[in-house]
């Protein structure tokens, strides 16, 4: 009996030694290609470069497939085909992926009291043109576009997996949530192949798996605004979570000396004019993506209240007010910085 126990103990020790050495022997493989209008980067720790490349290839295929469904830039996308049915008197059946992201989006709009709203497509279209022409949208055109906006006019039928866009001319736009959704979906594909220590960066919307071998987490660089528009680089240490940053320091339009953010207030149809940078950490990249967008629109107190609805989520807001930089954060955000 004692001899058997010794043999079992020896086996466990040897097995543990082998597993540890396998983990430590893993290398980091990085794969990158353009997707959804942004650099799309996949990082995988693995022992086998060929298998890692195969997993990355499957993940990129997943991203491309979802983009063909969600993109409003692709005329033949499923989203645009759905938009074309707006104002009709019937529900349109949609794919499982599109229905799933629409459910996410409507829940996001409800929880944020409309600060995130996927029905802003007609207004977003005007602002895209305005950015190209470096002028504000025509007020009359903006008024007409705003009449087509409202997430409450999007109706879902769970049983039939179908959608009715009540108002004619409605255009759904999944910006502010789509990249996070795709990042999370592609990470799930990679992890399903056995590569748990992996990370996906979809144009700054980052889905993060288990920590790299022998480390406490992935080192994620973010930039925090400082006084006089300087940027302070900081490192976060993260695992099994996601992070997204949003704000007008990255995309904005300057007209007549006034700065307009690429993020539009759904209540007014006007690009945000305050200078704010928002970083959100949450368990799912879809959630961190739309929360970062919503918290760029909401007042600070409402942003902090919204984050509390998601256990473990963290928020950092940096805003320039009257020439002075103000920072607000949830108590747990500081713990994610690398010491």
Predicted regions and their residues:
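Mature catalytic core of soluble alpha/beta enzymes
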Residues: 2-10, 23-339
């Amino acid at each position: 009996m004692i001899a058997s126990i010794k043999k079992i103990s020896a086996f466990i020790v040897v097995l543990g030694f082998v597993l540890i050495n396998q983990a430590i022997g893993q290398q980091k493989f990085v794969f990158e290609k353009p997707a959804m209008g942004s650099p799309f980067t996949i990082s995988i720790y693995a022992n086998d470069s060929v298998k890692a490349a195969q997993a990355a290839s499957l993940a990129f295929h997943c991203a491309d497939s979802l983009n063909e469904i969600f993109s409003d830039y692709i005329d033949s996308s499923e989203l645009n085909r759905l938009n074309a049915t707006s104002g009709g008197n019937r529900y349109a059946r949609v794919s499982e992926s599109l229905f799933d992201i629409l459910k996410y989006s409507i829940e996001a709009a409800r929880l944020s009291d409309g600060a995130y709203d996927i029905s802003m497509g007609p207004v977003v279209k005007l602002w895209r043109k305005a950015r190209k022409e470096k002028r504000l949208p025509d007020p009359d055109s903006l008024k007409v576009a705003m009449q087509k906006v409202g997430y409450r006019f999007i109706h879902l039928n769970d049983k039939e997996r179908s959608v009715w866009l009540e108002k004619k001319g409605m255009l759904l736009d999944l910006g502010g949530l789509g990249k996070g959704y795709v990042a999370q979906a592609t990470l799930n594909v990679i992890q399903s192949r056995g590569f748990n220590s992996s990370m996906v960066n979809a144009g700054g919307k980052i889905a993060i798996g288990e920590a790299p071998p022998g480390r406490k987490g992935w080192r994620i660089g973010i930039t925090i605004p400082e006084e006089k528009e300087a940027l302070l680089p900081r490192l976060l240490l993260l695992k099994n979570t996601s992070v997204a940053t949003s704000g007008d320091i990255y995309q904005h339009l300057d007209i007549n000396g006034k700065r307009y953010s690429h993020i539009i207030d759904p209540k007014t149809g006007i690009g945000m004019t305050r200078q704010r940078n928002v970083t959100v950490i949450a368990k799912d990249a879809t959630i961190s993506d739309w929360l970062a967008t919503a918290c760029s629109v909401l007042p600070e107190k409402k942003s902090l209240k919204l984050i509390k609805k998601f256990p473990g989520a963290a928020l950092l807001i940096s805003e320039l007010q009257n020439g002075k930089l103000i920072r607000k954060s949830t108590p747990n955000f500081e713990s994610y910085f690398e010491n």
